[in-house]
Every structure is written in C-alpha cells, then in structure tokens.
UniProtKB/Swiss-Prot annotation:
Disruption phenotype: Increased leaves, flowers and seeds methionine content, and leaf and root S-methylmethionine content under conditions of sulfate starvation. Reduced MGL-mediated isoleucine biosynthesis from methionine.
GO cellular component entries: cytosol
Name this polypeptide is given: Methionine gamma-lyase
Gene3D superfamilies for the chain: Aspartate Aminotransferase, domain 1, Type I PLP-dependent aspartate aminotransferase-like (Major domain)
Enzyme Commission number, as recorded: 4.4.1.11
InterPro entries in the record: Cys/Met-Metab_PyrdxlP-dep_enz, PyrdxlP-dep_Trfase, PyrdxlP-dep_Trfase_major, PyrdxlP-dep_Trfase_small
C-alpha cells in the first residue's frame, strides 16, 4: 500500500479540439491525453495546479456541456467508444450518464483536493457511499464499520444492504483497535468503513493505523471525509477510497445536493464499467449545471475552511470557559486532539464543527430556540458547511435512524447539539448573540 500511495497521482488531461471530417478520419484519435502530476502537500496548491478550463469562446469560466448525448463524425467511432478503445481520456463522450466534460472537470478538482488518481461526482453523498459499497462488496460479504456514523449510512449498512444484498456489517468503536482487529474476518471482510471525524460526536479516527491493520488482512479502507475537506487528506494517510457529500462544506451554499467518490483510476474505471460498474448501472448522475456551480466554489474552499475552523476554535474555547460540555478536536481536552494534530494539513485548523452536550433533549431544544429566535445566532437545520451557523439535536434528527442502544453505543446523548459554525457577521457580534442566549438558560 505504501508503494501505491507514493505513486498515486491525480490525472489531468490536455484538451482536444474537434474539427471537420477532413482532419484525418474526421473523428481522429488525438494522442492520449498526458497525465500531469498535481500532487501537493497542500490541497489548495494541488487544486491550483490542475489545468484551468476556459470557455468555448475564451471565457474565463468553462462552458457548461448540457448535452445528454454526443455526436460522432464517423459510424465506426461509436463502436470504438462502446468497446472502450475511445473515451473521455481522448475527449470522446457517448452519453452523460457515462461521462460528461463539465462533470469530469469537477471530478479532476475533487481528485486534486483528496490527492487521489481519479474521482467521479454523483448526485448525492449517499449515492456515492452506496455505489462504493455495492462495488466493493459481493453478496454474502462482510463490512466492519464505526459504530458512530451518519444515520443514513448506518441505516444503509444495518438494514438495506443485509436485506437486499446479504451484506452484513459489524459495528465497532473505531478508537478500539483491538475490537476492530477482532471484527475483521480474514477472507470474508471486504471493507473497513469509517468517518474521518465522526458524525455527530466528532470522534477522530486514526486513519494511518486503521489502514495498516486493514491492509494486512486484505481489506479495503473507505473513509467519509465530509466533515474535514482540506483539513484532512485520508488517501495520503493510507485510505483506499474517500467519499464525500459535496452538499456540505465543499458546496458551502446549502443549495446543492451532490457527492463524490475519490480513489484509484482502476476503481473509477471498474465503477463505470458498462457491464458491472455500480455507478454506470445505478446511474447516480450529476447534472452538468450542478457540476459547473460546484467547480466555481472549490477554488475558495480553503479560505472558507480556515474561517469555519477559526471561529469554531474560538467558540469552543469560550463555551468551555462558560462551563459548557463542548466537544471539539481543537481543544486539548478532546480525547484524540494529539492524533488529529498529527494528521491535519497545516493552516486549516481543526474543522468547522463542534458539539455541545446539553444532557437532555429539552435543554438542547431550549438553547437552539433561543439561539435562533431570540438572538439570531444561527438556524435550526440539519446539514453543515453553510455560511450561517446551523444546529440540530442529533439524536432526534440526523441520527434518528439509530435505536436507543445504538445511540448509546455511538456516544450520542439525548441532548447532543451538533453545530456547524458559520462565518457571516463578525466573530464578536455572533459570540455576543450566543452568550445572550446562553445566559437566558
């Protein structure tokens, strides 16, 4: 695996212009696009190093390829595309469920962001997760997963996959490496799945050690990095596949639903195979117009994450000083603070999420009501990564798919408030609003 990581480089393809049919055979195979290394220790630098796509008429922004289907100049070209001889790496496209130039550009950005060879962008985060699991696991297969996960993912693993595909999951405390090792059944377990920073407890996974353990037993490591884009780079730390809900921090506008699968070039090719690829056959296709919107936001993701993280750090420290039970990886009291500090990319802080344990749902709801309706500190809403602060009581919302015993095992108390810290207004202005609401408690 170490050798694989050393040679893993995102692919950046050069452009191709189609001319008329007199140019060679009319649909001439332009020399296969060269791969240019864009790996960089800093994700922002890696994103900046990929080729900038200009518009069709020289616009500084790329054009939106809104076509569902694509024409060819010669009949034989169609056959060559369906046999795999020609494809997107040569700038040949068939149908936008397969590949689309605008979506492919966003995929290149996502690969650069995560430091992987390739990526494929999907219609939602859950479609990315489910497609990966269905590709990597066969009927009768076994998964080991963290007990603390987003509720939708937990439901997929604990209910949907066993019922429809006979794929079972053992849930374990991801910080208990002995339990993880014991849960892996060599020769049967196919995937180790966890979140880089757990939703909603903000437990931090030891990605390098967990990856080492899994690879020793031939298990593929899949990491959901939705909570920590820019902050953590799981693939560089040993993970094989990184999944995202792009709807969150990467979008930043709470207006788009999207996802991504980031991994090796071989994985993406397998998932897009005409006969056996989960992405190809399930069709969780991203709209080109959505891809264009997102591609315009990724260049300033680093700036946004720095401010999310900065404010979350300040708020967490001040909440702690008020005597609140606050959970944030940037606090030295966090159980995995040193671990997280050793894994993060420099200058992006510890992430834009914090959690407050109010002990009971009644107290949690009371605080959130004051914060929204009395002082306008933030909004009661699920999701995260928005420029306004979003807050929800996880046990009764995004983790409601878990039963009481599962919530207890995951460390989700009835009064746990997950807070995605925004950056509108001044820091002191927003803190004053928080303090006023807290004092009313």
């Amino acid at each position: 695996m170490a050798h694989f990581l050393e040679t893993q480089e995102p692919l950046v393809f050069s452009g191709k212009k189609r001319n008329d049919r007199d140019d060679e055979d009319g649909d001439a195979l332009v020399a296969k696009k060269s791969a240019l290394a864009v790996c960089d220790a800093d994700p922002a630098a890696a994103i900046a190093n990929i080729r900038h796509e200009f518009g069709e008429h020289g616009g500084v922004n790329m054009s939106i390829e809104a076509s569902a289907t694509f024409t060819v100049m010669e009949p034989d070209t169609m056959r060559r595309m369906f046999t795999g001889e020609l494809g997107p790496d040569n700038d040949f496209y068939v149908y936008s469920r397969h590949f689309n130039p605008t979506v492919l550009n966003l995929s290149r950005q996502m690969a650069a962001l995560e430091g992987t060879q390739a990526a494929y962008c999907t219609s939602s985060g859950m479609s990315a997760i489910s497609s990966v699991m269905l590709q990597l696991c066969s009927s009768g297969g076994h998964v080991v997963a963290a007990s603390t996960l987003y509720g939708g993912t937990h439901a997929l693993l604990s209910h949907f996959l066993p019922r429809t595909c006979n794929i079972t999951t053992s849930f374990v405390d991801i910080t208990d490496h002995g339990a993880v090792a014991n849960a892996i059944v060599e020769g049967r377990t196919q995937v180790l799945y966890f979140e880089s920073v757990a939703n909603p407890t903000l437990t931090v996974a030891d990605i390098p050690e967990l990856s080492r353990m899994a690879h020793e037993k031939g298990v593929t490591v899949v990491v959901d990095n939705t909570f920590a884009p820019m902050v953590l780079s799981p693939a560089k730390l040993g993970a094989d596949v990184v999944v995202h809900s792009i709807s969150k921090f990467i979008s930043g506008g709470a207006d788009i639903i999207a996802g991504a699968v980031c991994g090796s070039e071989n994985l993406v090719k397998e998932m897009m195979d005409l006969r056996g690829g989960s992405l190809m056959l399930l069709g969780p296709t991203m709209n080109a117009k959505v891809a264009f919107e997102l591609s315009e936001r990724i260049p300033h993701l680093g700036l946004r994450m720095r401010e999310h993280s900065h404010r979350a750090q300040v708020y967490a420290e001040r909440m702690r000083d008020l005597g609140m039970k606050v959970i944030y990886p940037g606090l030295e009291t966090h159980p995995q603070h040193k671990l997280f500090k050793g894994m993060v990319n420099r200058d992006y802080g510890y992430g834009g999420l914090l959690s407050i344990d109010m002990e009971t749902e009644e107290k949690a709801n009371k605080l959130m009501a004051y914060l929204q309706n009395a002082t306008q500190f933030g909004f009661m809403a699920v999701s995260l990564g928005y420029y306004e602060t979003l807050m929800s009581c996880s046990g009764s919302s995004t983790s409601s798919e878990l039963d009481p015993s599962q919530k207890e095992a995951a460390g989700i108390s009835p009064g746990l408030v997950r807070m995605s810290v925004g950056y509108v207004g001044t820091l002191e202005q927003k803190w004053t609003q928080f303090e006023k609401a807290f004092l009313r408690m």
